[in-house]
UniProtKB/Swiss-Prot annotation:
Domain of life: Bacteria
Record's GO cellular component terms: cytosol
Name under which the protein is recorded: Ribosomal RNA small subunit methyltransferase G
GO molecular function: rRNA (guanine-N7-)-methyltransferase activity
Binding positions (S-adenosyl-L-methionine): 78, 83, 128-129, 146
Pfam family, one: GidB
InterPro entries: rRNA_ssu_MeTfrase_G, SAM-dependent_MTases_sf
Entry keyword annotation includes S-adenosyl-L-methionine: yes
Substrates-to-products reaction catalysed: guanosine(527) in 16S rRNA + S-adenosyl-L-methionine = N(7)-methylguanosine(527) in 16S rRNA + S-adenosyl-L-homocysteine
Function as written in the Swiss-Prot or TrEMBL entry: Specifically methylates the N7 position of guanine in position 527 of 16S rRNA.
EC id: 2.1.1.170
Subcellular location(s) of the protein: Cytoplasm
Amino acid sequence: MDPAFHEALASGIEALGLPVDEAARALLERYADRLLAWNRKVNLTAITAPAELAEKHLVDSLVLLPVLSGARTLLDVGSGAGLPGMPLACARRDLSVTCCDGVAKKIAFVKAVSAELDLPVRGVAVRAEGDPEREGLPRADAVVSRALADPDRWVPVGARYLAEGGTLLAMLGREVDRAALEAVGAAEGLTLVGLDVYELPISRAARAVARWQRR
């Protein structure tokens, strides 16, 4: 992998103080390598520059590690190429991850690469519409989506996959209104328990992670 990839990954992990050891970094590099290789045949990502991929796909997924410290299961909805689920599984081998997406070719990538890297990841080719039993999806300790960035759309769907005591996560790439986040959660019986705002260290792109739990 390009040296720029290693530099971007290391600087992002260190700048944000993320708990990612050397074994996890090696897995992340292998995942990124497979992602770029598959992307030549299957449309998985528009980001192909190694440094940008490291920051905007890997580091931006790994920012969830601190808020997942107590979780044993994770459901990643609209996962695409396994983001953020597969990078998180690289860093948390004890975390059981389910990645779902309506595009079968993307889930084929998730299944093949998770098997190759021996990651605790299951891929399910289904569009999540809020009916876990029919869709064959689990209720999880943590439920997240990068694909559904609009909380008004995401929260009503994602809340249906929460296990008892679970946390619903929204990864936001824009300015956020705390009152609006509180309101959309309250409509589903959820309380906003956290709103973490940060910048990606290289691009300075603004990001936020919102967290809700059931009242």
